[in-house]
Amino acid sequence: EVDVRLVGNEVALKQGEARLLTLAGAYVLRPLGATLERAVVLYLKGLGLKAATAESCTGGLIAKRITDVPGSSGVFEFGWVTYADRAKTEMLGVPAEVLEEHGAVSEPVVKAMAEGALERSGADVAVAVSGFAGPDGGTPEKPAGTVWFAWAFRNGGTVTEMMFYPRDRESFRQMVSQKALIGMLAARKPQAVTE
């Protein structure tokens, strides 16, 4: 996250803002100066969408960041912390055989987590994360710092992504929550179905 501060008279500020939006408009949070979590809440609220979270390695940090925003109850109703495999199965419906075959930190598991959260919550967008925060855990194929993300959208399928953040636990959790929130900004307003 980068903060840009513009200083000058009103005309210079408007010109600077226009130039900034021209150069990096897709990456600028609205309203200008908003935190990422506030931008997510305002964005979802503006579209009339509800969100849910299914978290493993972040231990509820994504949900915490969303609910730190006043008015977030208008967009956020459900969050699961499913640290253990049993919780992923019992609470989100992740098939035990998928966990056994692929392990908790895998694309099939995180996809099932997001889709389970979407189904159980009735939300429009659900984000799920599962990773090895470290310093322990991980394998040679999936070392500490490996994390899988999934964003399930009621009107647009599920998107998955794997990232590697070799950091201390707290930095890892912050980076994962940041990426998870950014992905929620891809939610789109449901389209009317016509026959």
Language-model features and meaning:
Residues 4-10:
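Short beta-strand-to-loop capping motifs
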